[in-house]
Amino acid sequence: SVFADFHCIDTGIKHGTVTVVIDGEPLEITTFRLAGEYEDTRPPKRVTFTSNLGADLGRRDFTVNAMAYSKMTETVDLFGGQNDLKNKIIRCVGDPDRRFNEDDLRILRALRFASALDFEIEEKTAQSLLKNCALLGNISEERIAKELLKLVCGKGAKRILTDFAPVLFEILPELQPMYKNSHDNPHHCYDIYEH
């Protein structure tokens, strides 16, 4: 009833998620929830709804995605998301290794957000995603393709594709021989990968 005047899409109703279209912009609205057990680095099949906002926000992937809004208290930001948003930083909530091992797709989501928003990836988060990039082998090609397409269309794509090339080599190993491999041509100043 809160969004009765808006177009709503049941995008994940069994997980408590609906998409509300406001002024042409789709916004995901989610009920407070706790995740079940992560199995094989995949999101839990079951969630438990909760009234504990802090517990819900603490299981989110990145600080910029771990904020909430309340009419009574306005923005609820327990993990520094507003500061990271202002400073254009992608940072995991809590331990990056834990976040990426809970859901491998978060590795590509970090790169995609950094590319789309032209943000930097915080150092511990960057080190962890490079260390854990082999987890990407667990993700379906369709899910990888969806994230990769959004990544390459971002404002910061060139920087992300260059700085995090080893992550891409996990999903597109054909690119690795091009990296740091010159054209042997005086008219090309870039290596084959960068070109």
Describe the role of every protein-language-model region.
Residues 1-195:
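Catalytic cores of the polymerase beta-like nucleotidyltransferase superfamily
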